[in-house]
Amino acid sequence: MDLPSVQSKITEIEGDLFHAPDGAALIHACNCQGSWGKGIAKAFKDKYPAAFAIYRSHCQNLLSSPRYRFEPAVQSEESHARSSRGVQLPEGTALIIPPQKRDSEANGKKHWIICLFTSRGFGRAVSPPDVIVRNTELAVADMTRQLAELQAGQSSEEESVEELWSCRFNAGLFGVPWERSRTVLEDAGLEVTVVRPHGG
């Protein structure tokens, strides 16, 4: 997998994300509370319980021992004021989970799981759309950096991310129009196959 390309290539298809080829990394947006309880996150939890356990542990560790990152000031679309914010991790980061043996044996394919932490909460506590988009920018940049590090440090015998596949993340329960998240992927210069459900 080449990272990042000069020009992005986002290919949208209808189908089942979980039918992605062996070695693909499946990208989805996550909350920071350790819950994959509804929507496509629930499907991820059901298909990849070992990956879910890693995600949940990652969130619980950061909830019990909070760490923060200070985000530089950005100009908001609504005003000309520049505001900065402190962000509690893992918000605005990515977690790349290698294929887990138990999940791969059950599903017949080795899939990497990439969690983009785009909303602090879920349900009524979901972050506002502008915050989710900003967190998506940060998380995609973090994912791209981590993938480049993985690629640079890999021996020929090690499993590697072969392709990036994604759902239309943030567009479901987080309520952000897909076009806004797609723009983030395009701006990152990534090659991603985006799968939407049949008729979706």
Curated annotation (Swiss-Prot):
Reactions performed catalytically: ADP-alpha-D-ribose 1''-phosphate + H2O = ADP-D-ribose + phosphate
GO biological process: peptidyl-glutamate ADP-deribosylation
Domain Macro: 1-200
Binding-site residues, substrate: 15-17, 29-31, 36-41, 169-175
Domain of life of the source: Eukaryota
EC number(s) on file: 3.1.3.84
Keyword Amino-acid biosynthesis: no
InterPro entries on file: ADP-ribose_metab_enzymes (IPR050892), Macro_dom (IPR002589), Macro_dom-like (IPR043472)
Keywords: Hydrolase, Protein phosphatase
Top-rank EC class of the record's enzyme: hydrolase
PROSITE patterns according to UniProt: MACRO
SUPFAM superfamilies: Macro domain-like (SSF52949)
One function term, GO molecular function aspect: phosphoprotein phosphatase activity
CDD domains: Macro_Poa1p-like
Annotated family: Belongs to the POA1 family.
Functional summary from the UniProt entry: Highly specific phosphatase involved in the metabolism of ADP-ribose 1''-phosphate (Appr1p) which is produced as a consequence of tRNA splicing.
Name this polypeptide is given: ADP-ribose 1''-phosphate phosphatase
Organism of provenance: Neosartorya fischeri (strain ATCC 1020 / DSM 3700 / CBS 544.65 / FGSC A1164 / JCM 1740 / NRRL 181 / WB 181) (Aspergillus fischerianus)
